[in-house]
Amino acid sequence: MAKLTKRMSVIRDKVDATKQYDITEAIALLKELATAKFVESVDVAVNLGIDARKSDQNVRGATVLPNGTGRSVRVAVFAQGANAEAAKAAGAELVGMEDLADQIKKGEMNFDVVIASPDAMRVVGQLGQVLGPRGLMPNPKVGTVTPNVAEAVKNAKAGQVRYRNDKNGIIHTTIGKVDFDTEKLKENLESLLVALKKAKPTQAKGVYIKKISLSTTMGAGVAVDQAGLTAVAN
């Protein structure tokens, strides 16, 4: 049996795996246990009452968190003409068409998000094997294929998170950094849950949001009592 590290031993002693914590208590616990030498992210896992094997029950989308994510996001945009200029004005780090595609083919991928205008997809389509596996392929369902590239750039910079359930029907994403105020983390979580409820497939039956867990980058999961969350109760 592997020996527990001192850090994991402390986490195991502090976190009751059988308990659902009030959201404020859960965040306080995460803050107490975040002892890494960097500012850890606060991540969330939401178990949804969907059948992930059925395509009409899959949940995918994007939402802008009211308090951002605490991350600096570099944006690449495929656009030309007025759209290209608008993307630059909105703060995109990389803007182009075939020239940008050539950079990516060479392995130059110094960006976190890729956005494309619809007319640029003829170029972006050639990059599916490169961008797809990295989760960077633009998609209209998450607002990264859009005629309004400037707005998409602003959203990405403002703290937009993309979400998509895994094969077990679980959404994994981030809601900020552990040094955020407790209220800001709570607001971000509530905002995400509102977006997930709006994205509920009509075919999904029974309890939709089944379980919510919070964790930090290096920490264990802490189950959250949904009774204290406005977005779930309403």
UniProtKB/Swiss-Prot annotation:
UniProt cross-references to Gene3D superfamilies, sorted A to Z: 3.30.190.20, 3.40.50.790
SUPFAM superfamilies found in the cross-reference section: Ribosomal protein L1
Superkingdom of this protein's organism: Bacteria
GO CC terms in record: cytosolic large ribosomal subunit
Listed GO MF terms: rRNA binding; structural constituent of ribosome; tRNA binding
Signal peptide: none
Biological process, per Gene Ontology: regulation of translation; translation
Classification via CDD domains: Ribosomal_L1 (cd00403)
HAMAP family for this protein: Ribosomal_uL1_B (MF_01318_B)
Function noted in UniProt: Binds directly to 23S rRNA. The L1 stalk is quite mobile in the ribosome, and is involved in E site tRNA release. Protein L1 is also a translational repressor protein, it controls the translation of the L11 operon by binding to its mRNA.
Protein family per UniProt: Belongs to the universal ribosomal protein uL1 family.
Protein name per UniProt: Large ribosomal subunit protein uL1
Biological source species: Enterobacter sp. (strain 638)
Gene: rplA
